[in-house]
Amino acid sequence: MRPTATPPPIVLLRAVTHAYGSRKALDNVDLALHPRELTFLVGPSGAGKTTLLKLINRETRPTRGQVWVAGIGAHELKASQVAGLRRRVGVVFQDYKLLPRLTALENVAFGLQVSDLSVSNEEAQDRARDALEAVGIGDRTASFPHQLSGGQQQRVAVARAVVAQPPVLIADEPTGNLDQATAWDLMDLFEDIAAWGTAVLVATHNIEIVTRLQRRVVTLVNGRLMRDQPAGHAGRMAWLATS
């Protein structure tokens, strides 16, 4: 039986450097992310993790190098072209960023319509309902954010990020406001999303989760990619993430 071939990368960074003035937030970083893969991005504060996520979502451009997302050269895009790339990248934040006057269903549907103006209200609500069901809170569609627990709010945020079925999902410290049990539930959800075929990249300081899950781990230190460890080899990296 032949081994399963690794699919081509959906995200590719080539010799990427990003500087804020004279300080290099990222320094000559090469990175490839593949479909069906959950990858953790770790490193001390100021290592460049958030900058790397912003480059993938084209919130900023590299000073040097190339950033490719779903075949699109993010580094080449003009401001008027960015929306097309962002439809291919779902984003989950630490603080949820839900609109307080909208229900869970409306928050997810609104996110879809913002990214794709051609979607009708009816289709947006149908797809939002499906997304909420997929992340395990299909029974809370009519709830407002203040009526939901932190874990439930984060699931709404994940549903909003994946409702357009992007090939890439990035998450910036998504467990920062969650207790450990709820954080584990969220990681289970990210593993499910990766199994759907999505490339999932999670920036985190939660070393317990990283070491126990034993997925691929990319370590940044002072803007440099210091280690890229495949699944099953995460236990030896904890000191780098906390130094």
Over which residues does each language-model region extend?
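Helix-to-loop junction immediately C-terminal to a conserved catalytic motif
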Residues: 57
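Conserved ABC transporter NBD signature motif
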Residues: 65-73
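ABC ATPase NBD coupling module
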Residues: 74-90, 121, 193-195, 237-238
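Short coil-to-helix segment of the ABC ATPase nucleotide-binding domain corresponding to the Q-loop/switch region
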Residues: 102-111
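Conserved signature/switch motifs of ABC ATPase nucleotide-binding domains
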Residues: 143-146, 164, 196
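Conserved ABC ATPase signature
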Residues: 144-148, 152-154
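Catalytic Walker B motif of ABC-type/P-loop ATPase nucleotide-binding domains
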Residues: 169-172
